[in-house]
Amino acid sequence: VAILGDGEDSRQRDREARREGRRHKSSMVFQSFGLLPHKSVRDNVAYGLKVRGESKQVCTERALHWINTVGLKGYENKYPHQLSGGMRQRVGLARALAADTDIILMDEAFSALDPLIRAEMQDQLLELQKTLHKTIVFITHDLDEAVRIGNRIAILKDGKLIQVGTPREILHSPADEYVDRFVQRRAAVV
């Protein structure tokens, strides 16, 4: 599967261009938080900006803005081990948002959270997206989650793209037997 950035296939770029693209065009929220244990919440959120070469003032201002926005005001000087799983995931989200990239990759970002915190994080992401209008690639194995937060869903099997469509298209017009079974499995649980 190719990733296009500014209409260009990322696989065709040289190593340095791909590195620059990762620094300036995309940010990531990991399933296992990906926080630096020896850095405070503020420093974790500012980390991508620092690596990119932003000034200390810009790093601090953006970090504090996004810490407040994701509901962690008052926790900027805490360390990851002092936070709950949901709070740690908010730090990861704030770090991705602080970088102000065009694309945010979220790899199973909410899967390790309990159902209530997970729903809270989904709500927060949907609210933020109303004003951000970012391209968010949200990887999940949970069709309910995909239907809830996605405006387009891509279903893959064994590394191959099987179907892309709106949630409605996926649910009501499965492309093949695999997608149909995937959808039916969801219906059986509900």
Question: What residues fall within each predicted segment?
Answer:
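ABC family nucleotide-binding domain
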Residues: 1-117, 121
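Helical segment within the ABC ATPase nucleotide-binding domain
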Residues: 118-133
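A short, surface-exposed alpha-helical micro-motif characterized by mixed small hydrophobic
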Residues: 146-148
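Conserved H-loop
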Residues: 31, 133-139, 141-142
